[in-house]
A protein has these predicted regions:
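Short, strongly hydrophobic alpha-helical membrane anchors
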Residues: 1-10
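Structural signature of hydrophobic alpha-helical transmembrane segments
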Residues: 12-22
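Loop-to-helix transition at the N-terminal end of transmembrane alpha-helices
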Residues: 12-13, 38-52
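Membrane-embedded catalytic scaffold of the fatty acid hydroxylase/desaturase
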Residues: 52-65, 80-81, 86-240
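Membrane-helix interface motif
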Residues: 63-74
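Cytosolic-facing loops and C-terminal tails of multi-pass membrane proteins
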Residues: 236-280
Length: 280
């Protein structure tokens, strides 16, 4: 099974991506959580167009990507995992958990460091919130994220299959927890004990400073609970809360691909970054 995953990485990743995207589209159509303010077709064309651009850019600059770095680390015996005499399955689980924590930490960093926040604003400027929001990131942030991932992989030395599984899980969970979908509240309450749910992560996309700087997790909810950044519900409620960034309301700027590409270079920094915000 592990060998099959390694040998069919691209097929597995593309298959899961398209499958989950279509499932989320169907779920959002049948059971939406909120009424969207912008045409879904317009947003999907532009958000997914940005995904295509990012994919091409990554293939040009980092053709081997994270999996290639994991292969190199394994071949050269780099990282913590190389000195651990553990069961292979335990090492895979451990590696996925460590990678998830590092993604959480990276997410905190892009809110805390002004230059990084400029890039991350593209993700938060979406005035609606659906599964494609979880995929829209500025190309420079995608490249930054890959460099950070390389450093983590070199230090950790995770099995190749762990990196593949993590990438599939991260992509799928990002689409799930950004979904404009309605979960039964009892189910949401149980799921978010361990995992990030759409209602939990939606709080993070609030225009309110303290809410936007909470719930940083993409996969596991435990990091926000452990480090005191967990917020249960938005003050205004999910139906009435405002999503996006104050000062970024113009449709073409926040929803059209050319506007998204230019957005980091527009406007002065405001008080929205963690280390410059005013708490309420």
């Amino acid at each position: 099974m592990l060998e099959f995953i390694e040998n069919n990485e691209s097929t597995i990743r593309v298959g899961f991506f398209l499958g989950i995207l279509m499932l989320m589209w169907l779920w959002e159509t049948l059971s939406p959580r909120r009424t969207l303010s912008v045409s879904r077709l317009f947003r999907w064309i532009n958000n997914l167009g940005l995904v295509v651009l990012n994919t091409i850019l990554l293939r040009i600059i980092f053709p081997a990507a994270a999996v290639g770095m994991a292969v190199m680390a394994q071949q050269n015996g780099w990282g913590l995992v190389s000195i651990l005499d553990w069961n292979p399955l335990l090492i895979i689980i451990f590696s996925i958990i460590v990678l998830d924590f590092m993604i959480w930490l990276q997410h905190v960093a892009v809110h805390a460091i002004p230059a990084f926040w400029r890039l991350h604003r593209v993700h938060h400027a979406d005035r609606d919130y659906d599964t494609t929001t979880g995929l829209r990131f500025h190309p420079l942030e995608i490249l930054l994220s890959m460099v950070i991932k390389f450093i983590v992989i070199i230090a950790l030395g995770p099995p190749v299959v762990a990196v593949i599984l993590f990438e599939v899980i991260l992509n799928g969970m990002a689409m799930f927890n950004h979904g404009n979908v309605r979960l039964p509240l009892p189910l949401d309450k149980v799921l978010r004990i361990l995992f990030v749910t759409p209602d939990m992560h939606r709080v993070h996309h609030s225009v309110e400073d303290d809410e936007a700087n909470s719930n940083f997790g993409f996969n596991l909810s435990i990091w926000d609970r452990l480090f005191g950044t967990y917020v249960d519900q938005p003050r205004a409620g999910h139906d009435a809360m405002t999503i996006g960034i104050n000062g970024f309301e113009e449709k073409n700027e926040v929803n059209r691909i050319d506007g998204m590409l230019l957005l980091p270079f527009k406007a002065k920094m405001n008080g929205y970054v963690i280390n410059r915000r005013s708490w309420k």
